[in-house]
Amino acid sequence: MEADVEKRPVTRQLMTHPGVGLLTALAFELVIGTPQRFHCGKQVASYVGLVPSEESSGDRRRLGHISKQGNALLRFLLVEAAQVTMRSHPEWRSRFFHLAMRRARKIAKVAMARKLAVHLYWMWRQGRDYGPQQKLGSQGRKLSSHVVQTRGSTR
């Protein structure tokens, strides 16, 4: 498999993200196919099956367990890679603990796997290697670059 990586520059690029190894990067590339198939990261997360299922009736909207659509192996690999990333990066760790305090730890793990899938998608789509300061979004700029005015103070 390592010889196959030399022929796949996208796999090498995805492996620059902490926690993402050869198997995860290769599976992500092969399952997704091409990033142009998807308009946004939300569609990638839905394709992989890392979004909640929805049961709606009238005005009632209930979000259930993850949809589990898509490749089960890729979903498993993304959850494992997200756990490795959480152990090695303080920003990811703090985000995980913030989610785990509000919800169960398993739900927080899946949320971090979804975040990883979206992050890998944007790295691939924009042709960038991982950078620790890099916050990728659909506009291709830092997500936290806007200033919000609230009651006379700036956040």
Predicted regions span which residues?
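A detector of single, family-specific signature residues
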Residues: M1-R155
